[in-house]
């Protein structure tokens, strides 16, 4: 298409050469800012109500989400984003950062990719739970405070003792640095985490959900 347009416009190859720059970005500028913070965080506190948190997703789970997303993505873009997300998982192996995840029960009950894919995803949660710097807790639907219904939030603490809050929605994302805004999100995470099951009870809850699939 670009080659034809180049010939019609007499651009002498300039339009065709722009092909690489017209590919969809792996992430927006705001997401890129969050990723930079994520890589250097000393503490990351993540609440997720609808999906398994990105750092905990299996390749199958990621693939299913991207392949069925709207608007549809090209195969090349899907492959790039899968590789990008899987690369992020390596952060969990760093001993210098603490990761605390609270996952709403609905995210475990939503069967993404079929029962077998979801079972392996739940096994992945139990696997990362064994890492000494990772904590995964489940928030049952009958214990959810109202703030748990407001959407996902990630609170990030940096080595410079700065704190940020990152929130996402349908095609939108917000990175907050204002102390009052961040404080509000930290308190919301604290309330949600306070209502979540203990780590031991969360493990048992995950196993029970897997048995029911």
Feature annotation, model-predicted:
Residues 1-110, 177, 191-213:
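Interdomain hinge/linker segments and adjacent boundary elements that couple functional modules
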Residues 115-213:
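C-terminal regulatory/effector modules of DNA-binding transcriptional regulators
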